[in-house]
């Protein structure tokens, strides 16, 4: 996807919100709208982009594979959906923005923040004390809220669900942080350690939120009270429902549509033409079953196509110190979902078995 696309999608709505804000405080100093926008906008855009790239990875072999339409996060767009998939998009995008802001803060990209040393010197546990340079997640969380949550201008149930899932994403960044330590002592005895907290790899956050997606909770609400909009009756119904929701639990309102079939109005492309996996090294069971999930169970057949690819081969090490490779062409068998023929299949098309039941 072009960088300009996600820049517009992830920031355009926020820019307007910030321009209308009188001012907001960051680390005890005041920044007015346009200046604040320019300071953090590139990090927000990069964070939103990394979130969507992770979404595409996590759902690469699912019927819904995080298409470009999933980037439309704000509730004033024409989709207004609150499905299980939408909950993940909000969470992973929010996490991506917070993650990037936190990382860039630790790298010294912003004058307004640095390491989190608030606990330095305190005893953390047996044989170790807090010290070093912990990643400043509080800063990342605060600025992420100001940007990402500003996209949510509604006050109905869907808006509250989106804000909740935004928060789930931010909490995921905190929940996956790692403790890193450095040993101190005579002759490397490591009699005491100095430790700090650092961000996990973003893939770990994606894996964490994918589990939350699988365990997401559907909210059952009275549709008549929901249609009341921002009335006292609607707010009461929403508050009552959210009272039983855990802060780290993804929630959704509507059942997912049939992602097997194309629906242009909803931005769903269907699974026809999608690649699937049948063989290969280090494939998970989920990946090995992708042909059944994407093709067979969607009423499509698996079609094998042979594609020519160019790859490095016959690599040799030369003293000193380079590796030289040849460029080899080879035919690789790939598998795609295709429509079933109404007549007998031509001889050149190989039908594949449907795979094992899950």
Descriptions of predicted regions:
Residues 1-12:
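Classical eukaryotic N-terminal signal peptides for Sec-dependent ER targeting/secretion
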Residues 13-358:
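Long, position-biased, composition-driven segments near the start of the mature protein
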């Amino acid at each position: 996807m072009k960088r300009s696309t996600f820049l517009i999608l992830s920031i355009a709505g926020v820019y307007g919100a910030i321009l209308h804000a009188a001012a907001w405080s960051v680390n005890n100093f005041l920044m007015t709208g346009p200046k604040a926008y320019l300071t953090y906008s590139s990090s927000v855009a990069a964070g939103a982009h990394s979130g969507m790239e992770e979404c595409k990875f996590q759902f690469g072999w699912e019927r819904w594979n995080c298409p470009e339409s999933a980037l439309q996060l704000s509730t004033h767009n024409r989709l207004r959906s609150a499905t299980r998939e939408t909950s993940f998009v909000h969470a992973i995008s929010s996490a991506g923005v917070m993650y990037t802001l936190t990382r860039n803060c630790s790298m010294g990209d912003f004058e307004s923040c640095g390491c989190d040393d608030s606990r330095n010197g305190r005893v953390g546990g047996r044989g170790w004390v807090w010290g070093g340079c912990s990643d400043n997640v509080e800063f990342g969380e605060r600025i992420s809220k100001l940007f990402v949550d500003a996209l949510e201008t509604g006050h109905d149930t869907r808006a509250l669900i989106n804000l909740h899932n935004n928060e789930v994403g931010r909490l995921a960044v905190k929940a996956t942080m790692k403790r890193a330590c450095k040993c101190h002592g005579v002759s490397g005895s490591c009699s005491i350690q100095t430790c700090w907290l650092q961000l996990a790899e973003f893939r770990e956050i994606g894996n964490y939120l994918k589990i939350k997606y699988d365990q997401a909770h559907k909210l059952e609400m009275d549709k008549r009270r929901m249609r009341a909009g921002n009335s006292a009756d609607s707010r009461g119904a929403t508050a009552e429902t959210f009272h039983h929701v855990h802060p780290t639990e993804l929630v959704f309102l509507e059942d997912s549509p049939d992602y097997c079939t194309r629906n242009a109005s909803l931005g769903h492309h269907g699974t026809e033409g999608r690649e699937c996996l049948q063989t290969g090294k280090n494939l998970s069971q989920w990946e090995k079953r992708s042909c059944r999930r994407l093709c067979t169970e969607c009423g499509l057949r698996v079609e094998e196509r042979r594609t020519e690819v160019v790859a490095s081969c016959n690599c040799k090490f030369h003293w000193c110190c380079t590796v030289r490779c040849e460029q080899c062409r080879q035919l690789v068998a790939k598998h795609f979902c295709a429509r079933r023929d109404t007549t007998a299949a031509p001889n050149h098309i190989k039908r594949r078995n449907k795979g094992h039941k899950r």
